[in-house]
Design a protein with these regions (language model features):
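SAM-dependent methyltransferase
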Residues: 14-91
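C-terminal lobe and adjacent flexible extensions of AdoMet/dcAdoMet transferase-like proteins
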Residues: 81-126
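A short hydrophobic/small-residue beta-strand
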Residues: 13-14, 101
């Protein structure tokens, strides 16, 4: 409703979110590497690992990131949650909110959405 208040009749509302990957959501609850980078303050190589626990009933993915350096294991630990929106749910939410989905694309190059698309991009009008 808030978005629609700021729209006029010709405004396009574009929503860009990733498609949840079932292989990522249903993997074992063990640490997996996420990324590595050189810390700009210490110059140390920092490795980030994560554990994720997905609750399919709520659609919430509970994620813990562990930051490790050569000098300290679990130097920092961050916990956060992410709500997963599969395409069928996102379409229903947009339509139930009064939007008309003009086009759904799967990449920023405007390629049509496919079953294997990593993104779900909705171009909507009110």
């Amino acid at each position: 409703k808030c978005v629609k208040k700021h729209m006029h009749k010709d405004t396009l509302f574009v929503l860009d979110i990733f498609v949840p990957n079932p292989l990522f959501l249903y993997r074992p609850e063990t640490r997996f590497p996420v990324m590595e980078y050189i810390d700009s303050l210490t110059g140390e190589l920092t490795k980030v690992e994560e554990i994720s626990v997905y609750d399919s009933d709520s659609g919430i993915n509970k994620i813990t990131w562990f930051y490790n350096t050569p000098s300290q294991t679990d130097d920092k630990i961050y916990n956060f949650t992410m709500r997963m929106y599969f395409p069928d749910t996102m379409k229903r939410l947009l339509i139930d909110s009064g939007f008309t989905i003009q086009k759904m694309i799967g990449k920023h190059d405007f390629t049509d959405f496919q079953e294997d698309s990593e993104l779900q991009i909705y171009i909507c009008k009110k």
